[in-house]
Structures are given as structure tokens and as C-alpha cells.
């Protein structure tokens, strides 16, 4: 299950079809001084100047054509590097007036020292807040009022994130503009503006096609596969925005099962027990895939809102439901483990990953030293072809995976983005499952392991507060026992 929280690179959650670019003269290529002058002239005309504080509510909005010119020009840029350059110029040249900020800050400090009355101080603070608003925010605000403007800004942020990832544009001004745009999108895509829609086999063909295309966690193979995923004992929901009904923004797939699932094969490959749902067979709801369809909405809390809304819908439909859990992939585990094997392989004689008996057992099967042989086997997933090697690796891989999820941190929070997402939601790191994803993708990315993050509804609030505030991870006895085994065997 793909996570949506911070760190998730909010990644790129999906390799998926982007919304159409805004209209414009396609294939425009600008170069050298012509490109710079054209961009500067465009920005000078399109970005509204900041009115004086006293005139902030009396200044008319810029002509719609000015914003439309920016949209058209941007949509016509053929190369990612050109779009990145324009965004870099926008961030660098049309941000906050630091001179005004310094002046207003000094004014606030002076009034505090003079112990002036509250009304005077509050107005000075309001002036400071006004000075802290970057000029490009005005451009984004006016673009949002155009027909299709919000969609354009979602794509613009996707381009900005891609440009940052490719290092086409960098620096604090760019990061700040990304944060401002993310904040604005979070307001426009707050839960009050989102519609929850359920997908069934009778949904419009266009919706089914989009859901199929955006499924990157467990790809849909064909129409029969898609029919199974929206059929009996399955639920599929998505959020759409009130301005674009029927257009999926984030999609959640749910399996209705008798207990908490420990492998994905039983969900995506096996047919349901009956064509008609028998309510007495349903005791658990398993969130096995969540996918963001628009890269520009990374970091906007759509996934969290969607899970909460779906839980309420399922409780209405199945009051007897007693368990809510994810069945999540563990992206990055194999890469992390290969990194450790590389480090320890270079330091001859050092072994903090396997016990002596495990090393002997693995070497007996592979015929080579543990570190070197495992690097090849784990990268390719070939190790599962040997029953003896599979058995020998179960103990150490479970132990190492528990540490990766529970012990490896980024700024005090779980390094793994999927873990971080669910822990922020207040879920419990509940169970690691052996050979839970036997696909090639599952074997090469996470050694076939998957993990359940369980949602105890009455505890999610306190758990979330504890994780976000104190960085405490709530975990089950299984996880903690595996972590303790790792710590006893390692000095990491």
C-alpha cells in the first residue's frame, strides 16, 4: 500500500497519466537571451504588484487576460528545462520583499518595547503578515479563478516537483514557492470540497479505465481482473473534487475478509468465495492499495481523509466489522538491506546482520560467503527458487525488516514512507508477513514481505498525537520481539 505522507518523495506515488496541459502554442522553443527576455516580460505583466497596505482591499484585480497569458505561455513550453527555468525565475524574482519584512518587523519590536495598546500592536502585526506574502501567491490566486485554473496549478506543482527531483531548478526560493503552492492546494482540496464515490462494475467505462490505469501498487492485468477488484467482497472508492466530479484524485481498494489478510495473492488473484456477499463471512476490512493520481497533490492529506471517510461508509454498511487494517508493501527494504551488505562486505570479518549459525546455513546452500551471494540473490529475487535458502532466510529477513520499519528513522520519524503515512494516521505497526507478495516486484523491492498497519479506531487519535509529537511508534508484540532480536545481534 503506497503511502501519501511526507517523504513520499510523497514520491512519486504513481507513474500515471497527467492531466492535459493547458492550451498554448505547442512546441515553443526559446533559447538564450530571447528566452530570458520573453520570460521576464511575461512575468512582469502577469504577476500583479503588491498594493500598499492601505490599498490592499481597494486595488482592482488584474485583468483576466494577464493570468491567461501566463497559462498559455507556460502550456506552450516544450521542454521540462524551459518550464523549470520559468518557475525558477518566478520563485527568485517575485517572492517576498525582504526589505519590507525587515521594516515591519522592526516596527512590531519597537511597539512591543513601548508597550503600546493592543490595537496598535495588532495592526502592526497585520502589516508584517501582509509583507510576508510572496508576490507569486497573487498570481496563483488569480489563476485559480480561471476556468480549469486549479487543474493547471496542480500540473504546475507536479512540474515543479519533477524539476526539483531532476535538479533542473534548486534553492530555498524554489522550496518556499513549492510550500506556498502546496498550502494553497491543501485549502482548495480540503475534505469539504471532496466527494466520496464508490466504483462498481456498473460505473462509467471512463472511470473504470482511469482506476485501472492509476493502480500502480498492484497493477491491473485485464478487464476480468478489474471486475474482480470492484466485485463481491471488494470495495473501491475515490475522492473527486467538487469542480471535477467523476475525476479520481486518490483511489482506495478494500478487501472484505474473514480475518486480517497476510498475503496479497489471496486478494488480487483468488476469486471470491461466492458471487453474492454473505455478511457473516465479513469481519475485517483490508486497505490493500491507495494511489494518488496527480503528482501535484503530493503532501496534501487526501489519503488520510479518504481512509477516514471509507471507514465510516463501511461501518454503515457492515456494522459487524471488527477489524480495519492495511496490507502494505515495504518499498525500499531490499535497497536498504543491499546497502548494509555492501558496507559490511567491504569490512572483512564484520557481521552484524546474521548469526554464526545463519551464516553457516546460508553459505552451505549458496556455496559462497554470505554477503556476496546474497547481494545477487536479493537483487534478482532468485533466492525463492531454493526451498532451503528460503527457509534459511526467513528468520533474518523478518528480523531485519522489523528493524528497518521500526528503527530506521528520518528526522526522528519512520524512514519508510508507507510506515510514516500510517503511523501519522494513528495506526499500529501490527504484523510483518512472510512471503506475502511473491510477485517479482514484491521480491525485488521488499523480499516478498508485507506489513499490516492496524487501525484500532478508538486509539488512532492518541497514537497519531504520540507519533507526531513525541515520535513514538506504537507496535505489536511481534514487531517488538523481532526488533529486540535484531538489537541483540547487532550494534547498529
Curated annotation (Swiss-Prot):
Its main location: cytoplasm. Malonyl-CoA binds at residues 298-304, 328, 422. The modification N6-succinyllysine is found at residues 167, 221, 385. It is an enzyme of class 4 (lyase). Residues 190-492 are annotated as: Catalytic domain. GO terms for cellular component: cytoplasm; mitochondrial matrix; mitochondrion; peroxisomal matrix; peroxisome. The active site is at residues 328, 422. Its EC number is 4.1.1.9. Transmembrane segments: none annotated. Pathway: Metabolic intermediate biosynthesis; acetyl-CoA biosynthesis; acetyl-CoA from malonyl-CoA: step 1/1. Keywords: Acetylation, Cytoplasm, Decarboxylase, Disulfide bond, Fatty acid biosynthesis, Fatty acid metabolism, Lipid biosynthesis, Lipid metabolism, Lyase, Mitochondrion, Peroxisome, Transit peptide. GO terms for biological process: acetyl-CoA biosynthetic process; fatty acid biosynthetic process; fatty acid oxidation; malonyl-CoA catabolic process; positive regulation of fatty acid oxidation; regulation of fatty acid beta-oxidation; regulation of glucose metabolic process; response to ischemia. Pfam families: MCD (PF05292), MCD_N (PF17408). Interchain disulfide bonds may form in peroxisomes (Potential). Interchain disulfide bonds are not expected to form in the reducing environment of the cytoplasm and mitochondria. The record marks 210 as: Essential for catalytic activity. GO terms for molecular function: identical protein binding; malonyl-CoA decarboxylase activity. Residues 1-28 are annotated as: Disordered. Disruption phenotype: Mice show an increased expression of genes regulating fatty acid utilization and likely contributes to the absence of changes in energy metabolism in the aerobic heart. Display a preference for glucose utilization after ischemia and improve functional recovery of the heart. A motif (Microbody targeting signal) lies at residues 490-492. The modification N6-acetyllysine is found at residues 58, 167, 210, 316, 385, 388, 441, 471. Changing residue 471 to Q: Mimicks constitutive acetylation, leading to increased malonyl-CoA decarboxylase activity. PANTHER family: MALONYL-COA DECARBOXYLASE, MITOCHONDRIAL (PTHR28641:SF1), PTHR28641. Catalyzes the conversion of malonyl-CoA to acetyl-CoA. In the fatty acid biosynthesis MCD selectively removes malonyl-CoA and thus assures that methyl-malonyl-CoA is the only chain elongating substrate for fatty acid synthase and that fatty acids with multiple methyl side chains are produced. In peroxisomes it may be involved in degrading intraperoxisomal malonyl-CoA, which is generated by the peroxisomal beta-oxidation of odd chain-length dicarboxylic fatty acids. Homotetramer. Dimer of dimers. The two subunits within a dimer display conformational differences suggesting that at any given moment, only one of the two subunits is competent for malonyl-CoA binding and catalytic activity. Under oxidizing conditions, can form disulfide-linked homotetramers (in vitro). Associates with the peroxisomal targeting signal receptor PEX5. This is Malonyl-CoA decarboxylase, mitochondrial.
Amino acid at each position: 500500500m503506497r503511502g501519501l505522507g511526507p517523504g513520499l518523495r510523497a514520491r512519486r506515488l504513481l507513474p500515471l497519466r497527467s492531466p492535459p496541459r493547458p492550451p498554448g502554442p505547442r512546441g515553443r522553443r526559446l533559447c538564450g537571451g530571447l528566452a530570458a527576455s520573453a520570460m521576464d516580460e511575461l512575468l512582469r505583466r502577469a504577476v500583479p504588484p503588491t498594493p500598499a497596505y492601505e490599498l490592499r482591499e481597494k486595488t482592482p484585480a488584474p485583468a483576466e487576460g494577464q493570468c491567461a497569458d501566463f497559462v498559455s505561455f507556460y502550456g506552450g513550453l516544450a521542454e521540462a528545462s524551459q518550464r523549470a527555468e520559468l518557475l525558477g525565475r518566478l520563485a527568485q524574482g517575485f517572492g517576498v520583499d525582504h526589505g519590507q519584512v525587515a521594516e515591519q518587523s522592526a516596527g512590531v519590536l519597537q511597539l512591543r518595547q513601548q508597550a503600546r495598546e493592543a490595537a496598535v500592536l495588532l495592526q502592526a502585526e497585520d502589516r508584517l503578515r501582509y509583507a510576508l506574502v510572496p508576490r507569486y501567491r497573487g498570481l496563483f490566486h488569480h489563476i485559480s479563478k480561471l476556468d480549469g485554473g486549479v487543474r493547471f496549478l496542480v500540473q504546475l506543482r507536479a512540474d515543479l516537483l519533477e524539476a526539483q527531483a531532476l535538479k533542473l531548478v534548486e534553492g530555498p526560493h524554489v522550496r518556499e514557492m513549492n510550500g506556498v503552492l502546496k498550502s494553497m492546494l491543501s485549502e482548495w482540496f480540503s475534505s469539504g470540497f471532496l466527494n466520496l464515490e464508490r466504483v462498481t462494475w456498473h460505473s462509467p467505462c471512463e472511470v473504470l479505465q482511469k482506476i485501472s490505469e492509476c493502480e500502480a501498487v498492484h497493477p491491473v492485468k485485464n478487464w476480468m481482473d478489474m471486475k474482480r477488484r470492484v466485485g463481491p467482497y471488494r470495495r473501491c472508492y475515490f475522492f473527486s473534487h467538487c469542480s471535477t466530479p467523476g475525476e479520481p484524485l486518490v483511489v482506495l481498494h478494500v478487501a472484505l475478509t474473514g480475518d486480517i489478510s497476510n498475503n496479497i495473492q489471496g486478494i488480487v488473484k483468488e476469486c471470491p468465495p461466492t458471487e453474492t456477499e454473505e455478511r457473516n463471512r465479513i469481519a475485517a476490512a483490508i486497505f490493500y492499495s491507495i494511489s494518488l493520481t496527480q503528482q501535484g497533490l503530493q503532501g496534501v492529506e487526501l489519503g488520510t481523509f479518504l481512509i477516514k471517510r471509507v471507514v465510516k461508509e463501511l461501518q454503515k454498511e457492515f456494522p459487524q466489522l471488527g477489524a480495519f487494517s492495511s496490507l502494505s508493501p515495504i518499498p525500499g527494504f531490499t535497497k536498504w538491506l543491499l546497502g548494509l551488505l555492501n558496507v559490511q562486505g567491504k569490512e572483512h570479518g564484520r557481521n552484524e546482520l546474521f548469526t554464526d549459525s545463519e551464516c553457516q546455513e546460508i553459505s552451505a546452500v549458496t556455496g559462497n560467503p554470505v554477503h556476496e551471494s546474497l547481494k545477487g540473490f536479493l537483487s534478482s529475487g532468485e533466492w525463492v527458487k531454493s526451498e532451503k535458502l528460503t527457509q534459511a532466510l526467513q528468520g533474518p529477513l523478518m528480523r531485519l525488516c522489523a528493524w528497518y520499519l521500526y528503527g530506521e528513522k528520518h528526522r526522528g520519524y519512520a524512514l519508510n514512507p508507507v510506515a510514516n503515512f500510517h503511523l501519522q494516521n494513528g495506526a499500529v505497526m501490527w504484523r510483518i508477513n512472510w512471503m506475502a507478495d511473491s510477485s517479482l516486484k514484491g521480491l525485488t523491492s521488499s523480499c516478498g514481505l508485507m506489513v499490516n498497519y492496524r487501525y484500532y479506531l478508538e486509539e488512532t487519535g492518541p497514537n497519531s498525537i504520540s507519533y507526531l509529537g513525541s515520535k513514538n511508534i506504537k507496535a505489536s508484540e511481534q514487531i517488538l520481539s523481532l526488533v529486540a532480536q535484531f538489537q541483540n545481534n547487532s550494534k547498529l
